[in-house]
From Swiss-Prot:
The lineage of its organism: Eukaryota, Metazoa, Chordata, Craniata, Vertebrata. It holds the Pfam family Metallophos. It comes from Homo sapiens. Binds 2 divalent metal cations. This is Serine/threonine-protein phosphatase CPPED1. Expressed in subcutaneous adipose tissue. Residues 47-250 are annotated as: Catalytic. It is found in: Cytoplasm. Its cofactor is a divalent metal cation. It catalyses: O-phospho-L-seryl-[protein] + H2O = L-seryl-[protein] + phosphate; O-phospho-L-threonyl-[protein] + H2O = L-threonyl-[protein] + phosphate. Its EC number is 3.1.3.16. The modification Phosphoserine is found at S2, S294.
Length: 314
């Protein structure tokens, strides 16, 4: 990491936490705030999808560069500034070992360096970042490039947990890494219960479910029934209010008991009818309110008055 990166937005997660938010300063509720959530910039997918070769295609990503630049510009214009900008995985399209991976990574870093230095980045690993069947080597590459693959941090009395959801999809080549995350997660959820934090929020790439906890296994876009139910019950027991994810390239989601599952569409390639966009998430003492904006809407109009009123409420 260069000195410029160290002093800029790349406050990479290390030691399972995010130095941008010191726990000793952020453990108490201080009033409403908001953050921006994006997913799947996935440099290269638009071309790969258009040619029908998602495994090997993706040799162009100019569209994704322009879209991500538009997202960054829209975020930088916001006032007040968001507490952070989280990207929920699939940062690039080229899987580990595939052509163009290095070039896509460098181009995304270049675009993200333009994020206002006062807005830390929170980076979540996706299946394209570490592979559909991750290995110790692919996870290590992600950690070296972008920071820890799972970690927690506090902002104003709210506990945020970032998970590596690929460990729940296929940990067959790195079972010990999956076990380590499981143990860590249990410890973090225990802290959430004991501390009675204002809210607890989870970020992961693959959704628990797309609409319902009881939906069929999709074998790609959701976690298996047994895995999702086990995780969701753990989250609910610890008081987690909402899980945010990407991966689906469409907006979706549902509720299981008192746990909201929010699936946010992509900055990059759309697989449904949603526009390229970002989600504004407002955290108040009582609730978590979120709204998806197209990049054009957020660029031209900013955040709507009703959300701004919540942010400014004392």
């Amino acid at each position: 990491m260069s000195a410029a990166e160290a002093g800029g937005v790349f406050h990479r997660a290390r030691g399972r936490t995010l130095a941008a938010f010191p726990a000793e300063k952020e453990s108490e509720w201080k009033g409403p705030f908001y953050f921006i959530l994006g997913a799947d910039p996935q440099f290269g997918l638009i071309k790969a999808w258009s040619t029908g070769d998602c495994d090997n295609g993706g040799d162009e990503w100019e569209q994704e560069i322009r879209l991500t630049e538009q997202a960054v510009q829209a975020i930088n214009k916001l006032n007040p500034k968001p507490k952070f900008f989280v990207l929920c995985g699939d940062l690039i399209h080229a899987m580990p070992g595939k052509p163009w991976r290095t070039e896509q990574t460098e181009d995304l870093k270049r675009v993200l360096r333009a994020v206002d230095r006062a807005i830390p980045l929170v980076l979540v690993s996706g299946n394209h970042d570490i592979g559909n069947t991750p290995t110790a080597e692919t996870v290590e590459e992600f950690c070296r490039t972008w920071g820890d693959d799972y970690f927690s941090f506090w902002v104003g009395g709210v506990l945020f947990l970032v998970l590596n959801s690929q460990f729940y999809e296929n940990p067959s080549k790195c079972p010990s890494l999956k076990q380590a995350q499981d143990q860590w997660l249990d410890e973090q959820l225990s802290i959430a219960r004991q501390r009675h934090c204002q809210h607890a929020i989870v970020f992961q790439h693959i959704p628990l479910f797309l609409e319902s906890i009881d939906e069929d296994d999709d074998y790609y876009f959701n976690l298996s029934k047994s895995t999702r139910k086990k995780l969701a019950d753990k989250f609910i027991h610890a008081g987690v209010k909402v899980v945010f994810s990407g991966h689906y390239h469409r907006n979706a989601g549902g509720t299981y008991q008192n746990l909201d599952m929010v699936v946010s569409s992509a900055i990059g390639c759309q697989l449904g009818r949603d526009p390229h966009g970002l989600r504004v998430v407002v955290v108040t003492a009582e609730k978590i309110v979120h709204r998806y904006y197209s990049l054009d809407e957020l660029s031209e109009k900013g955040i709507e008055d009703d959300l701004m009123d919540l942010i400014k409420k004392k």
